[in-house]
């Protein structure tokens, strides 16, 4: 087992990474202070790992209940969030009840948001079961739900007590979900660590094959980088925005097609292709680096052409973005691997990128 720490003073927490961690009682015990636990999971993950988690919690002598949500990005909304609150209230959960998010990014984001809101804040633990959630969404305290007009526009910054990332859970991931997670690994290397990007290029096939050593290193290094960024800028006042490379275009794709049509990581992968193209057009990135970026995204079996939503629709969707200010779209662009720029771009350049990178 590897442990990475997120250094946030009195709100610091560990990220435990390894195989078989869902069943290890001692990893949960220090973070559960009250007399009850509510597991929040979904219809896909509960049959796979719910019993193992409940068995791990049983020796603690807590009252354990489970809320099972429908599976998918399409359900990341108020109605599904209320199912969590319904379960908590029905079970008489109190301020010391610990929520445990067992699932991917949707489950983690909604459980964290529910924890932030219920009785104005109860503790929660992240147990991410997808590669995307292990390398990205479970770390850093971003929680929330989608709105029909924009992704993740309603939420809160609320840190977990711990992240327990069981890489053994990745063996049951569908191939599309695995590729979606590799997209966030590629993003992390591209924005923050040229050496890690080199490693991803050399090992993308090992990741595709789910080789445990490659997956463990990808999760570890991605978490180290994200933990460092979050410690420096917890609430996305500046530096943390670089983690949104590929997300401005990507979120527009998700909202434009309807949540769940493309997986989040698929949209981010394509969004990085689009952001790379725009980076070259603005004279920030060299063509050879853009080609390397596109090649590793394609090698991860991610889409490299965006849907033809139309220029006006893309622009409208990108203006509904957390980085936008007074309606001005901000992009995270590459200068070189490991070096980014947060900037606006002329509409003509964005239109040229859309013409080149959409169907």
From Swiss-Prot:
Pathway: Metabolic intermediate biosynthesis; chorismate biosynthesis; chorismate from D-erythrose 4-phosphate and phosphoenolpyruvate: step 2/7
Keyword rRNA processing attributed: no
Keywords tagged on the record: Amino-acid biosynthesis, Aromatic amino acid biosynthesis, Cobalt, Cytoplasm, Lyase, Metal-binding, NAD, Nucleotide-binding, Zinc
Cofactor note text: Binds 1 divalent metal cation per subunit. Can use either Co(2+) or Zn(2+).
Stored InterPro entries: Dehydroquinate_synthase (IPR050071), DHQ_synth_AroB (IPR016037), DHQ_synth_fam (IPR030963), DHQS/DOIS_N (IPR030960), DHQS_C (IPR056179)
Residues that, per the record, bind NAD(+): 71-76, 105-109, 129-130, 142, 151
Gene Ontology CC terms, in alphabetical order: cytoplasm
Lineage: Bacteria, Pseudomonadati, Pseudomonadota, Betaproteobacteria, Burkholderiales
UniProt subcellular location: Cytoplasm
Family: Belongs to the sugar phosphate cyclases superfamily. Dehydroquinate synthase family.
A GO molecular-function descriptor: nucleotide binding
Predominant cellular place of this UniProt entry's protein: cytoplasm
Protein name, per record: 3-dehydroquinate synthase
UniProt key word ATP-binding: no
Function field: Catalyzes the conversion of 3-deoxy-D-arabino-heptulosonate 7-phosphate (DAHP) to dehydroquinate (DHQ).
Residues at which Zn(2+) binds: 184, 247, 264
Annotated disulfide bonds: none
Species in which this protein is naturally found: Burkholderia cenocepacia (strain HI2424)
Cofactor(s) essential for the protein: Co(2+); Zn(2+); NAD(+)
EC identifiers of the protein: 4.2.3.4
UniProt catalytic activity: 7-phospho-2-dehydro-3-deoxy-D-arabino-heptonate = 3-dehydroquinate + phosphate
GO biological process: amino acid biosynthetic process; aromatic amino acid family biosynthetic process; chorismate biosynthetic process
CDD domains: DHQS (cd08195)
